[in-house]
Regions:
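Hydrophobic, aromatic-rich transmembrane alpha-helices
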Residues: 87, 251-287, 313
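Transmembrane-helix signature of polytopic, membrane-embedded enzymes
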Residues: 89-111, 129-130, 145-150, 276-278
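Membrane-interface transmembrane helices that cradle and orient dolichyl/undecaprenyl
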Residues: 94, 99, 135-154, 181-184, ...
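Short hydrophobic alpha-helices at membrane interfaces in multi-pass membrane enzymes
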Residues: 141-160, 189-200, 275-285
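Membrane-interface alpha helices of multi-pass inner-membrane proteins
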Residues: 150-167, 173-178, 203-204, 284-292
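Hydrophobic/aromatic-rich transmembrane helices and adjacent perimembrane loops
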Residues: 171, 288, 294-330
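Perimembrane helix-loop-helix junctions
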Residues: 172-203, 267-271, 319-325, 330
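Short periplasmic/luminal acceptor-recognition loop of GT-C membrane glycosyltransferases, typified by
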Residues: 174, 364-421, 434-457, 487
């Protein structure tokens, strides 16, 4: 195991060094832009139509306030968050394995993260992992201590913070409360108090965030977006099956096949009741549901599953689990550890190969060049105080506005809302809002990106005739760039 650990550490250092120049890219600039709007006095959901929860904006706002909107600040934040997860993962796994195996588990998660490439840096599901693991750790410590009230409460607080990033974390919060109650009763303590502390702690941070949102005037718009769009409409867009999604994840099936195998071996090596392994196993089940329920098939939504499988894996390679000998029936006739070591070594090789492939992919470089080109093209077209409307998803349009410090005349930071469920009255209302906003407050330019989601190509505007007519009437084509078109406002409009 020491050889595998040393190899993992060297590979991790290599990937960290290789990631030092990763740019702020893909989804992250969108969340940065919403955070920037908030810093400028904007109101979430009223001034930025988005599907994410306020906790995401607050984290990005903290990054902007401390380090600014540049690539380096984002890179340092992502690595610091990864280091925090790694340290907590080591502390979580150490009592059910050994120091070397726990360190290897932390390195394994680091390899998983860095093997994804620049676009996965700071993704919301990755940020969620720290809160999920802190919650599980708090509950485990509460069961291990004679008086675990503060630990139960701290675990609940962490899980509540996670729910402000992704609401699906609420399922794991309930599971952790149940484990706290069952474990406390097994120890002859109050099950109700243990569960209530986790549940009560989980309400604190969401309540504070809701209060902040209400104070900013964003609570009603948030509820309207969630109930009028996200739940009934967005949740149905682009849904794919779990197996179908993993076909286009690079090394995805190999990675999770090996991780799942290590997790199962870790469970087989455990005593009948180990709160840390029980919580990790439930976390893995939650992680699978977290991916399946979202239904989009995006690779970064697998982070919680990867996290908890990495938490289970060290027990599979430790010579002893929980300080006791492994049960003979669980040892697979004496070859459990050898099988686990072989699987671990293969997984490190797989993640290394994936990481090398993802270090400098052409599509990331192309997107960065597109952002730079659009920034140059827009700068001479926009006077101080003017706005620009972008019709894009993650192509880089909003990123260019962030660099230039430009606002939009409407709240729409994406355009995909307008092209699914076109006959639904709620989508028609969003379309009408966009066209009315462009007419009431004409921007200096409208930027149409060729790539969007789920519809591709400039021809998608034909399905939105009111917008196409508005562009033809008031915003003639001025610049054709790499993957975008800039329609500048007529001088007489």
């Amino acid at each position: 195991m020491r050889l595998i650990s040393a190899t993992s550490a060297l590979l991790l250092a290599y990937l960290i060094w290789g990631s030092r120049a990763w740019p702020l890219i893909h989804d992250a600039p969108l969340m940065h832009y919403v955070a920037w709007l908030i810093a400028q006095g904007g109101v979430p959901y009223r001034d930025a139509f988005d599907m994410n929860l306020p906790g995401v904006y607050l984290l990005h706002l903290a990054v902007l306030q401390v380090g600014g909107a540049g690539d380096l600040a984002w890179r340092l934040f992502d690595l610091a968050w990864l280091a925090a997860i790694g340290a907590l993962l080591w502390a979580y796994c150490r009592p059910v394995s050994d120091a070397v195996a726990a360190g290897a588990g932390a390195a394994l998660f680091g390899l998983y993260h860095l093997s994804g490439g620049a676009w996965r840096a700071g993704q919301r599901d990755f940020l969620l992992c720290l809160f999920l693991l802190a919650g599980a750790y708090g509950v485990a410590r509460g069961l291990e201590q004679p008086d675990g009230r503060l630990a139960f409460l701290a675990g609940g607080l962490a899980l509540g913070a996670g729910m402000t990033v992704k609401p699906h974390a609420g399922f794991f919060w309930l599971l952790c409360a149940a484990v706290a109650a069952v474990g406390a009763r097994r120890a002859g303590r109050s099950a109700g108090r243990a569960g209530a502390l986790v549940l009560g702690g989980g309400l604190v941070v969401p309540a504070l965030v809701v209060a902040w949102l209400a104070g900013r005037g964003g609570l009603a718009p948030c509820v309207a977006v969630l109930t009028g769009y996200v739940l009934p409409l967005y949740s149905q867009v682009g849904r794919v099956s779990v197996l179908g999604a993993t076909r286009w994840h690079a090394w995805g099936r190999a990675t999770f096949g090996l991780l799942a195998g290590l997790g199962l071996l870790g469970l087989r090596a455990s005593p009948a009741w180990s709160p840390r392994l029980v919580l990790a196993a439930l976390g893995a089940l939650y992680g699978a549901a977290h991916f399946a329920l979202q239904g989009k098939g995006w690779e970064y939504q697998l982070y919680p599953l990867a996290l908890f499988l990495c938490a289970l894996a060290p027990a599979a390679v430790a010579r002893r689990a929980d300080g006791s000998r492994t049960r003979p029936a669980a040892d697979l006739r004496g070859i459990r550890r050898a099988v686990a070591l072989a699987a671990w070594a293969l997984l490190v090789l797989v993640l290394g190969a994936k990481g090398v492939e993802a270090r400098e992919p052409e599509w990331i470089a192309e997107k960065a060049r597109r952002v730079a080109a659009l920034t140059r093209d827009l700068a001479p077209l926009v006077r101080p105080g003017e706005t620009v409307q972008v019709l894009d998803t993650t192509g880089g349009g909003i990123h260019a506005l962030l660099r230039l410090g430009l606002r939009q005349p409407t709240r729409f930071i994406y355009d995909f809302h307008f092209f699914h469920h076109p006959d639904d009255p709620r989508i028609r209302a969003l379309r009408a809002e966009l066209v009315a906003g462009l007419a009431a407050h004409p921007p200096a330019a409208v930027v149409v990106f060729e790539e969007s989601w789920p519809e591709l190509g400039y021809d998608r505007l034909a399905a939105f005739p009111e917008l196409a007519q508005a562009l033809e009437r008031s915003f003639p084509l001025a610049v054709t760039g790499p993957g975008y078109r800039i329609h500048a406002k007529r001088s007489d409009s």
